Design a protein with these regions (language model features):
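AAA+ P-loop NTPase catalytic core and its hallmark functional loops
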Residues: 1-174
Length: 174
C-alpha cells in the first residue's frame, strides 16, 4: 500500500499524525483536504523560529473602550471546536512554541490547559480535535518528548496524486 492510501485510512481515525518527507510532495495539501469529518473546521499555521506560543495559545488585544480582551489563538480555537489543526514545518518551532505544543499534543482523553486569561478558563479538546503536523526532515529532528506525542508518523515519499490533479494540465507529468 502506498503512503497516500495508508494516510487516507489512518487520518480519519487518528487524533495526532506527523507527516514527513521531501518538500513539494503534497503533505499540507492532503492535510487540508482529506479525511475531514463532516463540517470539520481547519486551522493552519506554518512555524518558524520567530513564531510565538501566543499565535497558538492566544493573547490580549485592545478593544474599542481601551480595555483588553482575550483572543484565543488557533490552537485553542481548534481545541474548543473539535477542529483539525494543521501545523506546517513543526521542526522549525522555537522553544516558546515547543513548550505549548506539548500541551496541545497530549492525549485528548487527558489533555487540559488553563488559559492565562482573566477567567483562568480551563479548556479541553472537544470531540474530533485533531493535529496533523508536517515537516521536511525526519522525526528524529524533533525533541523526543514531542515526537513521542504522535502515535502515527508517516513518511510521504511520493507526490500526492490528488495534488497533481489540481495542477494545470500543462504541468501534470512534468
Amino acid at each position: 500500500m502506498d503512503c497516500w492510501n495508508l494516510l487516507s485510512k489512518v487520518l480519519p481515525v487518528t487524533p495526532r499524525v506527523l507527516l514527513y518527507g521531501p518538500p513539494g510532495t503534497g503533505k499540507t495539501y492532503f492535510a487540508n483536504t482529506e479525511g475531514l469529518k463532516e463540517n470539520q473546521q481547519i486551522y493552519q499555521t506554518t512555524l518558524t523560529q520567530d513564531s510565538t506560543a501566543a499565535e497558538l495559545l492566544g493573547h490580549y488585544v485592545p478593544n474599542e473602550s481601551g480595555a483588553f480582551d482575550w483572543l484565543d489563538g488557533i490552537g485553542i480555537k481548534a481545541w474548543k471546536e473539535g477542529a483539525r489543526l494543521v501545523i506546517n514545518e513543526i521542526d522549525n518551532a522555537g522553544v516558546d512554541v515547543m513548550t505549548f505544543l506539548h500541551a496541545l499534543l497530549d492525549d485528548p482523553k487527558f489533555a487540559k490547559f488553563t488559559l492565562p486569561n482573566k477567567e483562568k478558563e480551563t479548556v479541553r479538546p472537544a470531540t474530533g480535535f485533531q493535529i496533523v503536523a508536517t515537516m521536511n526532515g525526519v522525526p528524529d529532528d524533533l525533541p523526543e518528548a514531542l515526537a513521542d506525542r504522535f502515535p502515527v508518523k508517516l513518511h510521504m515519499d511520493t507526490v500526492n496524486p490528488s495534488a497533481i490533479q489540481e495542477l494545470p494540465a500543462n504541468l501534470q507529468g512534468v
